[in-house]
């Protein structure tokens, strides 16, 4: 995730994955990767509740294993949940068999039909198998809240610059992203609402 918007060539290589939803609707889809963790995820949930916004959480299996109550709390509050592998494994760096085992092990804990590969990195063969089991959800806008080179103001500016109808927007409920995300998320929601955007969770298909 080195760019705010994924390059056209990469999107063309994986056309059957979901990069954007309902392009004609004035709706955006907030997503949160890498949780759940007790230091950050509850704050995100409370913030979303305060603004009446539903979102989608792509969870790492190891975190769910440690904090199963947070998985249940996310769903209880009306958000959707997706699989983000068991150990935040990057598909481009490992063989298909090993990668699929990691994903399926995570899904024993998460139980979702949505999947997002960490860093958006996936081999074509991995994608082919996973498409038969999951809707693969990529993204239209990466806020880069995790970047130590960006300030919270710059993360917010990424949202303002790149958000559009149907955008799937990536934040992170992680310690690495916490400072920037906590600055940018409420301000991004307020700005998007001012621009007339609605919010929705990605349904677990």
Locate the predicted segments by residue:
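N-terminal pre-catalytic segment of deacetylase/amide-hydrolase enzymes
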Residues: 1-31, 36-51, 66-67, 187-205
């Amino acid at each position: 995730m080195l760019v705010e918007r994924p390059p056209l060539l990469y999107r063309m290589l994986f056309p059957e994955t979901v990069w954007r939803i309902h392009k004609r609707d004035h709706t955006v889809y907030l997503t949160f990767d890498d949780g759940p963790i007790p230091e950050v995820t509850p704050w995100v949930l409370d913030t979303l509740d305060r603004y009446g916004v539903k979102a989608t959480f792509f969870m790492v299996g190891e975190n769910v294993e440690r904090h199963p109550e947070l998985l249940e709390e996310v769903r209880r509050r009306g958000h959707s949940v997706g699989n983000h592998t068991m150990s935040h494994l990057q598909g481009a760096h490992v063989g298909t068999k090993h990668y699929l085992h990691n994903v399926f092990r995570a899904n024993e804990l998460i139980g979702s039909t949505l999947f997002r590969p960490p860093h958006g990195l996936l081999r074509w063969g991995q994608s082919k198998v996973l498409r038969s089991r999951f809707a693969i959800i990529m993204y239209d806008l990466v806020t880069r809240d995790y970047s130590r080179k960006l300030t919270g103001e710059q993360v917010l500016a990424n949202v303002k610059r790149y958000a559009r109808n149907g955008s799937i927007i990536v934040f992170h409920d992680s310690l690495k992203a916490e400072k920037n995300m906590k600055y940018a998320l409420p301000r991004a929601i307020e700005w998007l609402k001012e621009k007339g955007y609605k919010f929705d969770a990605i349904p677990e298909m």
